[in-house]
């Protein structure tokens, strides 16, 4: 099985990149792709850059060049669901854009034309993540992850997202774009993120402080998933 792994920032991929054996590195269009093996699994690890366009472009290159059987998105996220703490892990059941609005033409909030109302994560991968988390005693929350080209750093913006997407458990800036590309290419995907902040007025300071912890937690989960595939 070939596994594609996508992270936006260097800090979010560096642990996994350091574990790749027989490594080949490709730099293309601002993206970096590390190819090789982790735990006898053939992997391609993409550092896409931040935001929806960078994530979509990088994921498209990853799928075209490497042709993975599945895609895992890893990294950090802002926690929204009640009780989530820094370092906790979230897994997607579905993803939507919190900054997309074509409701004037009858689409659901967060839905784009020619796309489903939400991008559904692969149920088998979601279940696998849940089982691994349970075995490892990891606090895991599954549910809707919302993406947009904004770092949410105010209580007002967070309240708006929660009001319009009441099932949201976490927010970030790339997952739905990755999911959209995987949907178009018919590639199973799942999002595994660790919480770095809680999206309030202190989010930027929390993010800077706890990004390394979130990156370590999400990378650890990805490694455990690779062991279980």
UniProtKB/Swiss-Prot annotation:
<keyword id="KW-0486">Methionine biosynthesis</keyword>
<dbReference type="InterPro" id="IPR010049">
    <property type="entry name" value="MTA_SAH_Nsdase"/>
</dbReference>
<comment type="function">
    <text>Catalyzes the irreversible cleavage of the glycosidic bond in both 5'-methylthioadenosine (MTA) and S-adenosylhomocysteine (SAH/AdoHcy) to adenine and the corresponding thioribose, 5'-methylthioribose and S-ribosylhomocysteine, respectively. Also cleaves 5'-deoxyadenosine, a toxic by-product of radical S-adenosylmethionine (SAM) enzymes, into 5-deoxyribose and adenine.</text>
</comment>
<dbReference type="GO" id="GO:0005829">
    <property type="term" value="C:cytosol"/>
</dbReference>
<feature type="binding site">
    <location>
        <position position="78"/>
    </location>
    <ligand>
        <name>substrate</name>
    </ligand>
</feature>
<dbReference type="GO" id="GO:0008782">
    <property type="term" value="F:adenosylhomocysteine nucleosidase activity"/>
</dbReference>
<dbReference type="GO" id="GO:0008930">
    <property type="term" value="F:methylthioadenosine nucleosidase activity"/>
</dbReference>
<keyword id="KW-0028">Amino-acid biosynthesis</keyword>
<feature type="active site" description="Proton acceptor">
    <location>
        <position position="12"/>
    </location>
</feature>
<dbReference type="Pfam" id="PF01048">
    <property type="entry name" value="PNP_UDP_1"/>
</dbReference>
<comment type="pathway">
    <text>Amino-acid biosynthesis; L-methionine biosynthesis via salvage pathway; S-methyl-5-thio-alpha-D-ribose 1-phosphate from S-methyl-5'-thioadenosine (hydrolase route): step 1/2.</text>
</comment>
<dbReference type="GO" id="GO:0019284">
    <property type="term" value="P:L-methionine salvage from S-adenosylmethionine"/>
</dbReference>
<dbReference type="GO" id="GO:0009164">
    <property type="term" value="P:nucleoside catabolic process"/>
</dbReference>
<dbReference type="InterPro" id="IPR000845">
    <property type="entry name" value="Nucleoside_phosphorylase_d"/>
</dbReference>
<comment type="similarity">
    <text>Belongs to the PNP/UDP phosphorylase family. MtnN subfamily.</text>
</comment>
<keyword id="KW-0378">Hydrolase</keyword>
<protein>
    <recommendedName>
        <fullName>5'-methylthioadenosine/S-adenosylhomocysteine nucleosidase</fullName>
        <ecNumber>3.2.2.9</ecNumber>
    </recommendedName>
</protein>
<dbReference type="GO" id="GO:0019509">
    <property type="term" value="P:L-methionine salvage from methylthioadenosine"/>
</dbReference>
<feature type="active site" description="Proton donor">
    <location>
        <position position="197"/>
    </location>
</feature>
<feature type="binding site">
    <location>
        <begin position="173"/>
        <end position="174"/>
    </location>
    <ligand>
        <name>substrate</name>
    </ligand>
</feature>
<dbReference type="InterPro" id="IPR035994">
    <property type="entry name" value="Nucleoside_phosphorylase_sf"/>
</dbReference>
<feature type="binding site">
    <location>
        <position position="152"/>
    </location>
    <ligand>
        <name>substrate</name>
    </ligand>
</feature>
């Amino acid at each position: 099985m070939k596994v594609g792994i996508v992270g936006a920032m260097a800090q979010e991929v560096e642990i996994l990149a350091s574990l790749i054996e027989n490594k080949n590195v490709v730099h293309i269009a601002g993206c970096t792709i590390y190819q090789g093996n982790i735990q006898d699994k053939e992997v391609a690890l993409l550092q896409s850059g931040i935001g929806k366009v960078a994530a979509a472009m990088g994921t498209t290159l990853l799928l075209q060049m490497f042709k993975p059987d599945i895609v895992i998105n890893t990294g950090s996220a802002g926690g929204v669901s009640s009780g989530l703490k820094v370092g906790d892990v979230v897994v997607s059941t579905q993803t939507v854009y919190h900054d997309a609005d074509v409701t004037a033409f009858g689409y659901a909030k967060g839905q784009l034309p020619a796309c489903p109302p939400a991008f559904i994560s692969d149920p088998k991968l979601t279940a696998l993540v849940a089982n691994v988390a349970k075995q490892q005693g990891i606090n895991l929350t599954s549910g809707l992850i919302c993406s947009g080209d904004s770092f949410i750093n105010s209580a007002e913006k967070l309240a708006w997202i929660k009001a319009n997407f009441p099932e949201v458990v976490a927010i970030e800036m790339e997952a739905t774009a990755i999911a959209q590309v995987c949907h178009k290419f018919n590639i199973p995907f799942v999002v595994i993120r660790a919480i770095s902040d809680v999206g309030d007025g202190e989010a930027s300071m929390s993010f800077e402080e706890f990004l390394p912890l979130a990156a370590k937690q999400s990378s650890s989960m990805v490694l455990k998933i690779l062991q279980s595939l």
